Regions:
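Acidic, low-complexity terminal tails and accessory targeting/binding regions
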Residues: 2-9, 94-106, 115, 165-173, ...
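Active-site glycine-centered loops adjacent to acidic/histidine catalytic or metal-binding residues
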Residues: 16, 89, 180
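Short active-site segment of divalent metal-dependent hydrolases/proteases
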Residues: 19, 183-184
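Phosphate-coordination/substrate-recognition cap region in phosphate-metabolizing enzymes
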Residues: 47-124
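Short glycine-rich phosphate-binding loop at a beta-alpha junction
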Residues: 56-62, 171-178
């Protein structure tokens, strides 16, 4: 393959649709809730908003909620041909060990106590919080199965690099990647500390450009595709 045919790869990182565990404010890493009715509706809206984008490839984590969302996008897409979903274990959400399925407030209260802070604001000021919440969870987990920051980032960034390498030929292109809120936050925070990653809505899009082995964050938590799709549905009625 000639290097002159390599081009930039634009990654469309999409968070999966809302699940029953999201709605119940339960910690959801490798445990896997089904999409709610609202989750499916918003995923369809975002998919319609993305329907005129020609994707070179489509990927998701191997967890059901991401696969279901990705299949909705592929079904609604009109611009791409023969788009087949590739499921990657390396794109899974963080594994939270004993906190899987637990109420989110319990996990984060434990982490706040461990870090000796009283609020997320204080945690952000004192720590690289995206990194330390992950490490704290791993330390607090008596099962010793929860993932620490380095373990997560190693598998996730390897997956992203592999995806970029696989799709940079023939002048690159646009790639759909349906993953998880925690993973998107970690990726964005790792690549560029200037973005606020606190909010990461279900079915939102965060865009990253990969060129010559380097990553650049272009946008984060973009809901305009969902808004566009919702407007398209009104017109179709």
């Amino acid at each position: 393959m000639s290097s002159k045919n390599k081009g930039k790869v634009i990654l469309y990182l999409m968070r999966h649709g809302q699940t029953i565990l999201n709605k119940a404010n339960r910690t959801q890493g490798w445990c896997d809730g089904v999409l709610t009715k609202e989750g499916i509706e918003v995923a369809v809206n975002a998919s319609l908003g993305l329907s005129d984008i020609k994707f070179k490839a489509a990927y998701s984590s191997d967890l059901g909620r991401a696969i279901k969302t990705a299949r909705i996008v592929i079904k609604e897409n009109k611009a791409s041909t023969n788009l087949k979903l590739k499921e990657l274990e390396g794109l899974r959400e963080v594994y939270f060990g004993k906190y899987e399925g637990e109420h989110e407030s319990i996990m984060f209260n434990d982490i706040m106590k461990f870090l000796n802070v009283s609020s997320f604001k204080e945690a952000d000021e004192k720590y690289d919080f995206q990194k330390e919440y992950c490490n704290s969870c791993a330390i607090l987990d008596e099962t010793k199965e929860a993932e620490d920051y380095n373990s997560v980032m190693k598998r996730v960034m390897k997956s992203l690099n592999d995806i970029c390498m696989a799709n940079s030929h023939d002048n690159g292109g646009k790639v759909l990647i349906v993953v998880h809120g925690g993973i998107i936050r970690l990726i964005i925070d790792y690549l560029d500390k200037n973005f606020n990653v606190r909010n990461m809505d279900n079915s939102s899009i965060s865009k990253i450009i990969c060129e010559n082995g380097s990553f650049k964050v272009e946008s984060v938590n973009d809901n305009s595709y969902s808004d566009k799709g919702k407007a398209m549905k009104r017109v179709m009625k």
